[in-house]
Amino acid sequence: YDKYAKLFYECQKNVYGNVTHYYATDPFHEGGNTGDMSTSDVSSEVLNSMLEFDKDAVWVIQAWQGNPSAGLINGLNGRKEHALVLDLYAEKDTHWNDSSYSGGKEFQKTPWVYCMLNNFGGRMGLHGHMDNIVSGVVDAANNSEMLTGIGITPEGSQNNPVLYDLLFETVWCDDATKTLTEIDTDQW
C-alpha cells in the first residue's frame, strides 16, 4: 500500500501542482468489503500516507451508507484535525446528530460539513426537501460543536437552482453574533 500511495500522491502533485491539502478517498465506500482487514488499521494507514506526503493533509470522508464506521474514525488516532466528514445527504438523511452512527454524535467530534446531495445521476427535476434544508442547517449551526461549513454534493448540478440558492441563503445573515433562525419559505 505504501508504495502505491506514495506514487498516487506524487502523480497528483505532478499533474495538478500544489493546489490543495484536501484529499478524498473512500476505502469502504457504500459498504465495501473489508474482508479480514481492520477498518481502524486501514484508516490509520491512509492518514499516515497522506501526512507523510503532506504534513497539512486533511482527509475528506463521505458520510454515506454506514461510512465512516466507528473503526474508521478510531483509526484517525486522535488526529481529527486532519479529517473532514461530509454529511453527504444531510438535507434528507442526517448523520451528524445520530449517536449510533460512526460511534458517536458529530462523527465522534470530528470536523464535518452539512451537505445537500439533492440530485442522483444528473436526473432532471424540480424537487427537493426545502423544509429540511431550512430547519436542518439552522439546527446544525445552533447545536453542533464541530460543524465547519455547508456544501453541495450533487451528482448533477445543472438543475433546480432554487434549492442551491436556498441552501446558501440559510447561513447568510447581516450580524454573525445573532443566532441563526429559519427562513420563512413563504416569504423568501
Where are these regions (language model features)?
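Catalytic-core regions of glycoside hydrolase
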Residues: 1-188
